[in-house]
């Protein structure tokens, strides 16, 4: 049984563009990592979101999502939005506005007994994203990596593992533009995910991974000289804080 009836979702439709509906299950036999192994067999785009509180304690929820409704990435002002088999490429100097525009389609209410995160963008913003916030900053493209400036996936459904109550919430956001059709679709998706949760997980055989030699993008001499320059800038008052970094890379022959 879902947490909200069709009539309750319709009541939200006047003020919200989407409503998260959910089914509650017991989590006594399923773990986030175990379910992730099942997800990997059916989807190539997925995430597991964990977090710590006070740097030492696991937070209450673990989130898993798969099959995003949209993928959005950008590098050097050239962006691409992919939804299903359709892809659109465009140039942008302000990708944050595009992200806000997309999220405006998902104005959702906070639903009692559900976590605050019930869907949205998941991904990363790289260091080079700063150039969109400060146009005066120019990065050396010759030293750039192959990573995108940002790479995001938009999820309208996810699975939340509640460690406190030992429960699982299967959450699907119902768009309110065609609420009856979308509510029925959400029911089907929730039932399908519940069936996935009930699938037995076969443990993978243990394999030892090999980590190659760790390399820096700077020599020790260059790094030390750069730190000395940073200290001089601070002494002269040109800067009050500088976070200097170097990039480390290594070959890895397994699946992270």
Regions found by a protein language model. Name each.
Residues 1-256:
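Extended alpha-helical targeting/anchoring segments
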């Amino acid at each position: 049984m879902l947490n909200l009836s069709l009539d309750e979702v319709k009541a939200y439709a006047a003020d919200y563009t989407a409503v998260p509906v959910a089914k509650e299950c017991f989590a006594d036999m399923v773990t986030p990592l175990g379910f992730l192994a099942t997800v990997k067999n059916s989807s190539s785009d997925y995430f597991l979101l964990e977090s710590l509180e006070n740097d030492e304690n696991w937070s209450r929820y673990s989130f898993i999502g798969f099959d995003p409704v949209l993928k959005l990435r950008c590098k050097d002002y050239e962006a691409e939005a992919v939804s299903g088999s359709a892809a659109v490429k465009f140039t942008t100097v302000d990708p944050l506005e595009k992200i806000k525009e997309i999220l405006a389609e998902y104005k959702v209410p906070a639903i009692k007994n559900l976590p605050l995160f019930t869907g949205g963008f998941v991904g990363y913003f790289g260091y080079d994203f700063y150039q969109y916030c400060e146009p005066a900053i120019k990065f050396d493209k010759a030293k750039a990596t192959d990573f995108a400036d940002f790479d995001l996936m938009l999820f309208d459904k996810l699975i939340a593992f509640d460690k406190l109550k030992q429960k699982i919430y299967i959450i699907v956001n119902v768009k309110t533009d065609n609420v009856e059709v979308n509510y029925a679709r959400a029911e089907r998706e929730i039932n399908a995910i519940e069936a996935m949760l009930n699938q037995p997980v076969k443990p993978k055989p243990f394999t030892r991974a090999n980590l190659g030699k760790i390399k820096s993008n700077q020599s020790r001499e260059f790094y030390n000289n750069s730190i000395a320059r940073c200290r001089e800038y601070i002494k002269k008052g040109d800067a009050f804080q500088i976070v200097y970094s170097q990039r480390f890379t290594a070959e890895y022959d397994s699946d992270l």
